[in-house]
């Protein structure tokens, strides 16, 4: 029986080494992505946990609002995934200006859409909330809660699209850290605004909504800083769009389809 020669053994060792290296790199990308998604979703879960110490109607009102906001988040995330693919493709071919263009076009169109959602839910949230409850008191609490959290929709969109940009560049850790910081802000402000702190009286469910909006705004601001800061920003060295409010139909078509 003929044994394997030195050359064959070397090839096998190299193949095993490459396989291990590839697996390690995949884990380094996937694990932060999973954690980032968990942290994004957990912002509402943390709020729910804190609201859980309040009255039953408060819990119910917050719960039915979360059903709507989570549905919208799935939409934002779906569009962002399309942007991530295109950004990664452009980055792989060295077209960093295109990366910035794709991100900014996606952000612009999503902000336009989210503005429509904000207006509708601010003035007529009862149309949608009525599907989940018929209790007048719960619906009133839910409508007032919704009127506050709609102001955080823009921050949520900015964070989602910024995550698409970072992940398209192969950086999955930065969005995870931003999401973790957002949750920390939500917890700190949540306890203070819900239950009160010192001379500050607790605002109950509306304190929870305010804390969530503050946390999402903080996260959005942090993302924008990391994208556009001088010298170290993700888009440093790239030229901005000539017209910010110009919509490139072909670019948007690729993202949304």
What does each model-found stretch correspond to?
Residues 48, 59-119, 156-175:
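Small-residue-rich hydrophobic transmembrane alpha-helices
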